[in-house]
UniProtKB/Swiss-Prot annotation:
SMART domains: FoP_duplication (SM01218), RRM (SM00360). Interacts with rpn15/dss1, mex67 and uap56. Residues 55-134 form the RRM domain. GO terms for cellular component: chromosome, centromeric region; euchromatin; nucleus; transcription export complex. GO terms for molecular function: mRNA binding. Residues 148-161 have a biased composition (Polar residues). Keywords: mRNA transport, Nucleus, RNA-binding, Transport. This is mRNA export protein mlo3. Residues 19-35, 163-179 have a biased composition (Basic residues).
Length: 199
């Protein structure tokens, strides 16, 4: 350090290599490529797959003193995991005895119906279980059950419609002419030849 301080400014500059002024590269606004970029998840498709795996039932005619926790405990232990359990309440805040249960698995709603439909509660009340189906899945299943029309039948129906149209148009173009008797035809022939002889 002492030796460098003793040197003059000219000596320090002369000792450094002559490289001239270094130009800095212009920064580009392009984003740098990121490694291992994860593809974006399609939220709609993910949500649709989750919804299609659910199953839902409505249980009615329950005692009014039954709580949501009791309903959930019953179905979780006997059927399977539940996503949501809710009770319907009246304007006075009292339970109507109607519970909505959404299961995590698609087949649990059918199992709950088979196991608890018509079962007695407190020895007097009959439980009523209804399976709530997704309307979009109902439409899809109905469309799948309808068989597509074959090409042969479709072309035959089209050709039949065209031929019927042609027949109707031909019938309209040709009016019904009255048929002439043999006497009328002979008379016309005599008149024709008689006029030719006069000429």
């Amino acid at each position: 350090m002492s030796m460098e301080l003793d040197q003059s400014l000219d000596a320090i500059i002369a000792s450094k290599p002559k490289g001239g002024i270094r130009k800095r590269r212009a920064r580009s606004n392009k984003p740098k490529p990121t490694k291992n970029a994860k593809p974006a998840v399609n939220t709609a498709s993910a949500l649709k797959s989750v919804i299609s795996e659910e199953s839902k039932i409505i249980v009615s005619n329950l005692p009014t003193d039954v709580t949501e926790a009791q309903v959930k405990e019953l179905f979780v232990k006997s059927i399977g995991p539940c996503k949501r359990v809710s009770l319907a309440y009246g304007p006075n805040g009292r339970s109507k005895g109607i519970a909505t249960i959404i299961f995590s698995r698609p087949g649990d709603a059918t199992r709950a119906y088979e196991q608890y439909e018509g079962r007695l509660v407190d020895g007097t009340r009959k439980m009523k279980v209804e399976i709530i189906l997704d309307p979009s899945r109902q439409l899809n299943s109905l469309a799948a059950r309808v068989s597509p029309a074959s090409n042969a039948s479709a072309t035959a129906s089209k050709n039949g419609a065209k031929s019927s149209k042609r027949k109707t148009t031909r019938r309209r173009r040709t009016p019904n002419r009255p048929k002439k008797s043999a006497e009328e035809l002979d008379k016309e022939m005599d008149d024709y030849f008689g006029s030719n002889e006069k000429e």
